[in-house]
Structures are given as C-alpha cells and as structure tokens.
Amino acid sequence: MKYLVDTHAHTIASTHAYSTVHDYIAVAKQKGLKLFAITDHGPDMADAPHFWHFVNLRVLPRIVDGVGILRGIEANIKNDAGEIDYFGDYLQELDIVLAGFHEPVFPPSDKQTHTQALINAIESGNVDIITHPGNPAYPIDITAVAAAAARCHVALEINNSSFEMSRKGSEANCVAIAKAVRDAGGQLVMGSDSHVAFSLGEFSQALAIIEEAEFPEERLLNKSPEALLTFLSKRGHKTLDDFAEL
C-alpha cells in the first residue's frame, strides 16, 4: 500500500533543516502525497523558530495543487510533569501537536522519569502524537506508555529517521512499542521526520517495523487523509473541514 500522509516535517524555520514549504509541496506532488504537516521544533530548542512562527502558520493555505498542509509543531517535553513549550489558546489554533524528548531541552535521565514525563504529556490533553518514543537514550516503560496512549487516544510515532540519521539502536524498542500499542488497542503513525524535502513520505524502515509487529493497518494513521483527519477531529481540532476535498 502507498501511504499518502506524513505528519512530521521540518522547514528552514528550524535552522538545522534545509527546505521551504514550497519545496515540500513540490516533493509531495512528485510523490503523490495528499497531506503533510509542517512541524518545526518548539521554541525552547536553540535553533527553533520564534513563538510567532507558530501563531502565524494561519497564513498558510490549506490546500495547494491538491496537497493539504497541516499547521503544526513538534513541541519539546520540558520536564517530568509532561509540560511542553507551547501552551494555552495558541494550541487550539494548530491542526496537529507533536511532542517528544530532545536533549537540549530535556537531558536524558532515568527510565522512571522518562516514563512519567511521557505519561503526563499524554494525559495533559495537549499532545496528539508522541515523537520517536523508541529513542534508546530515553528508556521508558513501554507497556505503561502504550496503555496510557491508548486510553487517552494519543498516537505513538514510529520515526523513520531514527533508523537512518539519528537515534541509532531504536529498532528493538520500536518493534516493542508497535506490539505494545497493538495489544493495548492504540494507534500508531509513521513519521519521516524530514529535515529536507527529499525524505518527505519516506517510511520504508518504519514500515518494516510495523510489519514485523503485525500492527493492524486500520489503526495506522498514515493509511489515508481521512484516517488522520478523523483522529485529529476526535481530539478536538476544529478547523479540519477545509480538507474535505482531499
């Protein structure tokens, strides 16, 4: 099956990434993608865009040349309380909120601290998707996190970049996560974590993890624009009718 949705992409607004919104649209068209999310790093990262970047995402058109653009963020989990670096009413203006651990904001600690931070972020209601939870630098209680995510209708990400450019050693953790989410009745999403447009929609290694875990496709958010948009709508995002024509 060809997957037409990517929830995780960074633009030049995050200065360690190298592509513009226009670049991503062009690649999405070339590859036949129907929907992708702009999710630059939250403002607590050293080279992240200013807070205003996320507020002003509303200027982006919803659909360009048949490609839908979700206005999002990859927020930073800041502490074991699960707080993120974007807040309040501004969260409601975004279409999608990703959050994860990043070493400049939350240095690795211990399994109990990491687990509590993720569960608190999941239970906060502020986060739709937890990014790269299989990072071996941040060991977690996988069963507990998967159960919390399923209970709170938060998706966990299988991050394709973790097997290519960063977070080496994620494979075994990600297989365990996929199996735990499968058994808990939760949802997964594959994210390219693109930092250059050429990798948008690239899921080959993440898909191998999904298949090894025998994860049911009906609970994989990439399977269609409708699957992701329905998930986001159920999580309280109000402005998604604009994508009805996709």
From Swiss-Prot:
Gene Ontology BP annotations: bacterial-type flagellum-dependent swarming motility
Gene3D superfamilies (UniProt xref): Metal-dependent hydrolases (3.20.20.140)
Cysteines paired by S-S bonds: none
Keywords noted in UniProt: Hydrolase, Metal-binding, Zinc
Matches recorded under InterPro entries: Phosphatase_YcdX_put (IPR023710), PHP_dom (IPR004013), PHP_phosphatase (IPR050243), Pol/His_phosphatase_N (IPR003141), Pol/histidinol_Pase-like (IPR016195)
Enzyme Commission numbers on file: 3.1.3.-
Binding site for Zn(2+) 2: H16, H41, H195
Cofactors, names only: Zn(2+)
Free-text comment on the cofactor: Binds 3 Zn(2+) ions per subunit.
Family annotation (CDD domains): PHP_HisPPase_Ycdx_like (cd07437)
Chain residues that bind Zn(2+) 3: E74, H102, H132
CC per GO annotation: cytosol
GO molecular function, one term: phosphatase activity
Residues that, per the record, bind Zn(2+) 1: H8, H10, E74, D193
Similarity-based family: Belongs to the PHP family.
HAMAP family referenced in this protein's UniProt entry, alphabetically: YcdX_phosphat (MF_01561)
Protein name, per record: Probable phosphatase Ssed_2939
Organism this protein belongs to: Shewanella sediminis (strain HAW-EB3)
